[in-house]
Each structure stands twice: as C-alpha cells, then as structure tokens.
Amino acid sequence: LDRNAFSSVADSLLAAGFKLRFRAGGHSMGSALRDGERVTVAPVDARDVDVGDIVFCQTWRGPLAHRVQRIEQAAAGAVRFALRGDASFEDDRPVAASQLRGRVISVERNGRAFDLALRGGALGRRIFVAALRARAALASATRALGTRGVLVRDPAA
C-alpha cells in the first residue's frame, strides 16, 4: 500500500475499534521500534495518553509513531501532544488530540513480542524508556571503543 492508502485503512480500522499490525519503517525511534519490526497499535482515547506512550497519529507528513514528550493544554482547552522520535534531538510539530489514532502496545523483535502497554503507568514507561536509552548508549559506546581496539578480549583469558 502507498502512504495514503495505508493511512486510510489504518484510520478506518482503528476508528472501528480494531487493532492494527504493520511493519514499522524508518529509524527515528531508535531501539524502541526498529526499521522492519512489526508493531501493534490499539485504538486510544486522547484522555488516556500519558507522557512516555508511543502513539500512532496522522501528521502533516503522513502516519507517524513517536513518543509523547509533553501534553500541553491551551487556554481554550485544546490539548496538544509534543512528540519526538527516540533517536531525535528535537520535538516534532505538536499534534492535536484529533490527530491521534492509537497507542503502540507491542513490538515483535526477532520472533518475540514485547508488550509496551506496561503496568505501572507513566513511571513504568519512563523506567522502561530510560533502560532502553541506557542500553542503546552502552551498545553504541561499546561499538565505538571496539573499533579502536580498546575493548579487545584477550584470547588467553
């Protein structure tokens, strides 16, 4: 499906209360959602979205799954969500509650499904996110050091 057709089908399924499963594309979510992994999205009411959730929404550039950084309420009562990909340094353009379609509830990695609808609410999600980022940073540092020969294992050990 092209982007517009996928967007239309996704909107229809989620609006009807169905879950949506698809292959993620791109690298903006770093280690949380990798390019080519299967993700499952469940419909969500904007009032049930918390900071730390990965939401699926319609944006000016098409469908997007990014993490909620902040929830902002305007004086007129309109709610907007500041999103960012885990591998990004800057927030995306804020999205309105009407642009949210669902929340990513699981990701399939190497044949195993990982539940992202964590118990423990926002604190649990923040701990999970911190652990993912720490693991990614450690892996990156290990690769960088390993390429310089600093972390070479002694074969005699």
How should each PLM-predicted stretch be described?
Residues 1-157:
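Extended hydrophobic leader/signal-anchor segments used for secretion and membrane insertion
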